[in-house]
Each structure stands twice: as C-alpha cells, then as structure tokens.
Amino acid sequence: MIASNVNALVIAPADSKALVPVLKKATDAGIKVVNIDNQLDVDVLKSKNLQIPFVGPDNRKGAKLVGDYLAKKLTAGDEVGIIEGVSTTNNAQQRTAGFKDAMDEAKMKVVSTQSGNWEIDKGNAVASAMLNEYPNLKALLAGNDSMALGAVSAVRAAGKAGKVMVVGYDNINAIKPMLKDGRVLATADQYAAKQAVFGIEAALKLVKGEKVDTNDKGVIETPVQLVTQP
C-alpha cells in the first residue's frame, strides 16, 4: 500500500501492536492513517511518537452491558467463566475487562478466563474444559459470538442446556436464532458497518487537511447496544 502511493489507509488490525512500525513508515511517507474496530496499542503508538485516530466502540462498556444483563439472571456468588478472544488484542482485553467489571460489581465468582482465539472450535474446546473442571458453573461469557456458538454446543454436549447461560458479543446473524430460543441470553451490536463509514469519512477529512472530531483520547466513538431475546 505504501509503495502504491495511496493517500490514506483505514485499517482494522488483527493485532494491536504488530502493525505499528509499518504504520509509522506510512505516516512518515505522508499517508493519513485511521484505525477502526480493534484499537492500536496506545503505549506502542507513543513509543513511535504516533497519533492515529481510532474509530470504534467502547468495547469495555459494551461487554459490561452484556455482563450486567446476565448478572440479573444469576445469584451473588455464582461461578462463571470468560472465553476471551485473542489475548494480545485490545478489543479482547477490553471486553474481558467489561465482563469482569459486571461480574465483580454483582459479586459473581469468575473461576476461569481462557482464550478461545475468536474461533467456534476453540471456543467450544475451552467451554468444554471449563464445564468439566467447574461443575457448578452457571454462565459462560464469550468475547464474540463465534466463541458463543462453540460454547452453546459445549453446554448441550455436557447435558447442561438450560442450566448454564451463554452470552456473546457482535450480534452476528448466526446468533439470532439462539437469542430467540434462549440458547444465548444476550450479545452486543457494535454496528461494524458504521465503523467503516466513519473511518472512511475521517480519512477523507485528513487527506483534505481538515481536523477530525475526536475525544481527548483520540477516539471517534461509535455506538454499541445490548441485544437480547426479541
């Protein structure tokens, strides 16, 4: 992209740290960069003296909305497990933090937090292991809906359907039937399409030499909403 002499890059990085040196080269070459979806690591950006605007939701807030809703269905002291995304990514870390905020506030016991790598199969394996190790588990909080799908299968295979609640994040199409029939209690919609639109709009402004409207943390915050049974 840098060699192609583009004017701007809108990037949703899989890793919050790995691409920062490349983006430093891009900005040094005069290319405007906007970060969407998964926020680049703030400390790594600072180490490269980079200021890259981020367009995306408050993942921690979104996960807390989901966790708060789940907590209303639980009893203080209940055991829960968290299936995290890729642990090195900012959005995974923030969602886990939001889940823990809600569980701590409601006095639930988080007995395990393990990475499911955002994947159905890995989420299933992690959920199965948790259900086996913690027979009193009452809920599984998955950092995305793909892992929630895997968790639902694990709950069914363990013979605990209706006894262990599952929540997710993203509101993908595949999760909607499960919300409807109760296999998944709740998820969060972060309107990914809006992130892309806002990201492109911000990039175009920067190319024109205009300022983008960010908060004091350099963020253009996009909506995130709790989604429950229709």
Regions found by a protein language model. Give the residues of each.
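Short beta-strand->loop
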Residues: 55-57, 81-90, 111, 115-117
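Hinge/cleft segment of the Venus flytrap/periplasmic-binding protein
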Residues: 83-87, 91, 101-103, 194-230
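Hydrophobic alpha-helical
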Residues: 7-28, 99, 111-112, 116-177
